[in-house]
Amino acid sequence: MRWPPWASESQAQQHNTKPPIEHNEKEHGSKSKSWESSVTAIDWAAFAEPRTIIPTVILTSGFLGAFHIHRRYLRRFPDAGSITPSHFRRRSLLGRVTSVGDGDNFRLYHTPGGRLAGWGWLPWKKVPTSKKELRDKTVHIRLAGVDAPELAHFGRPEQPFAREAHQWLTSYLLNRRVRAYIHRPDQYQRAVATVYVRRALDFPIPFRRRDVSYEMLKQGLATVYEAKWGAEFGGEAMERKYRKAEWWAKLRGTGLWKDFRRNEKEWESPRAYKTRMGLEEAVQPRVESKK
């Protein structure tokens, strides 16, 4: 029936259908509001329950602990410049010696964690062997507390016993695992370190830990570092130990100390050699410019 009587039939139909739609919208809105409020209340209550909190705390702690362990113990340093200051005088680097450049420095491929972390037996943790693979991936180490005779380089002649020192250090360290206690970086982007090595055929005690700098001084293949600036021994006790080893080698006339007593005036230490070469190179350009 049309109502009001003067309304058309189409208008009456629209009027009759509006209330149910509005009623449905109101009903749907109230249902959605009640659903949202109930979901919110249930979620917050679940988060506060021990069965939710305990696994979350354990998982988060485990993740943070793993990150801390990896960053502190398993992080690999590709070169000396990447070593963080927190390692200086506190931590050590374990790695394999890939090359020996001179009588008192070498290259180390850092293998954090050693065999326990998979180095040497896991397929993806192999130490590279080719020069191409090792490029920009090794730490340049300078032995602390010692100065070895200089090999011929940069146009400078070879110093007596330089080849013997280089050969000895190569046979003693090359392809072996060593532990380097880092003291500080030097002006040549090297890490000055006290280095220890264990050798299976070490008489009389196999696998005894040996201080490489100390062994070189005993063999008479290096002198105690004499420079006024930049000398690093790793402490006063180590300096006394090194000077005592040098004194004994000098007394026995071992290695580069062989002719020290007979020809002390002309005998030249590695430090004196470097100083003389530096002075000659400084004077040479002036002479050439005058010509």
From Swiss-Prot:
The active site is at R142, E150, R190. The keyword Transmembrane helix applies. It is a single-pass membrane protein. Residues 1-34 are annotated as: Disordered. The chain crosses the membrane at residues 53-69. It is found in: Mitochondrion; Membrane. The keyword Transmembrane applies. Its main location: mitochondrion. GO terms for molecular function: endonuclease activity; metal ion binding. Keywords: Calcium, Endonuclease, Hydrolase, Membrane, Metal-binding, Mitochondrion, Nuclease, Transmembrane, Transmembrane helix. GO terms for cellular component: membrane; mitochondrion. Ca(2+) binds at D147. Residues 8-17 have a biased composition (Polar residues). Residues 91-259 form the TNase-like domain. SMART domains: SNc. Its EC number is 3.1.-.-. InterPro entries: SNase_OB-fold_sf, Staphylococal_nuclease_OB-fold. Belongs to the LCL3 family. This is Probable endonuclease lcl3.
